[in-house]
Amino acid sequence: MKNLKKSFLAFIAAFAVSCGDPELPVELFPEMEYGAYARKMSQTGEFNYFAIESSALDIHVEYYDGNQGANIAQYDIDVEYVDMIDGGAKSVARKDMRTISASEFTTNADGYLSSDINLGFSATMSTLGITQDDIDGGSYFRYWFTITMTDGRVFDYNNTGPNLVSSSAFAALFRLNAYIVCPSSLEGDVIIDSEDGGLSTLGYWTFSVTGHVD
């Protein structure tokens, strides 16, 4: 697994080299400018419209650059709200949410610098200055992630190659959509009493039906 991860470094180098100048000399691998990214290793949780305070996304990332992540200064997280119900009328522009500095990175079981990131539903709404009345199920929060290197270089969604972002092998976390879900509030046993009935020799009768809703 470590050999596979180390091979990622050769791949990300290509994304930091300009492709707009045909006169650039061919560089040896050790002398090339390296890029950097955070690889999403796992993600759990959801944003439940009916349980805002307890809803969150928990994400584990590993950091990669030409020096095993040691040249990364910080990992910034921004967020915006994307309204899908009212034609964008409720959308809220991107705002800063959190910065994870290199001093907060930890070394995981595989020996890589990493972070456990908690994105709370309530904390996200507070960042954007909105309440439950301002959001709808089916809309989503879009998170933007940016890496800043110790030498000042910046890597984000806009200057990172699409293969690095979309490939499951690399899973570079530079953008994430978190949809708001509305689970059914009718889960459990439901008893339905009918108003319909009929006459018999014993009088007028009604009936009820019990069912289970998932």
Where are these regions (language model features)?
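C-terminal motif of bacterial Sec signal peptides marking the signal peptidase cleavage site
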Residues: 15-18
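Short, solvent-exposed loop/hinge segments that bridge or flank secondary-structure elements
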Residues: 192-214
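Sec-dependent signal peptide recognition
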Residues: 3-10
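Acidic/polar, low-complexity intrinsically disordered N-terminal segments immediately downstream
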Residues: 4, 20-144, 148-193, 197
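Intrinsically disordered, low-complexity segments enriched in polar/charged small residues
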Residues: 10-11, 44
